[in-house]
């Protein structure tokens, strides 16, 4: 439990325009019983849908090859809470959703914990490159060392203290 503060003010009290600048990928991704595409562009104005942006995001989140193998591609229905998908596929769709909204600040909360090591490393490398290209700041919460290898700064919370490790 906790809260996110910006200038000592709870983020829930800040204008929605500010909130749109922040993306979040939780450990447990919720997917609607809808298409992959609608789960990714969820929350975005459908009038602003951009197919080329979606394709770039699918590549960055390593979900493009999986989607291209499906007969209906991004129009494939995922079932209630992603029942037709693996945990790793659901996580990659969650990452794609967060990136599609084009935040300036992205929080990854154990966002790659259901991925195999190779896919995880590829996504982390892609996110590192994406963040440089898009001027995106990423805060990654993780217990895995390989996740931390892609971070420019590392902090550890220990005994209620924040310690800089890198």
State the predicted function of each range.
Residues 117-118:
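Helix N-cap at the start of a conserved alpha-helix in ABC-type nucleotide-binding domains
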Residues 129-140, 148:
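Conserved catalytic loops of ABC-family nucleotide-binding domains
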Residues 106-110:
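Catalytic Walker B motif of ABC-type/P-loop ATPase nucleotide-binding domains
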Residues 3-7, 19, 37-80, 124-127, ...:
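ABC ATPase nucleotide-binding domain helical subdomain, centered on the C-loop/LSGGQ "ABC signature"
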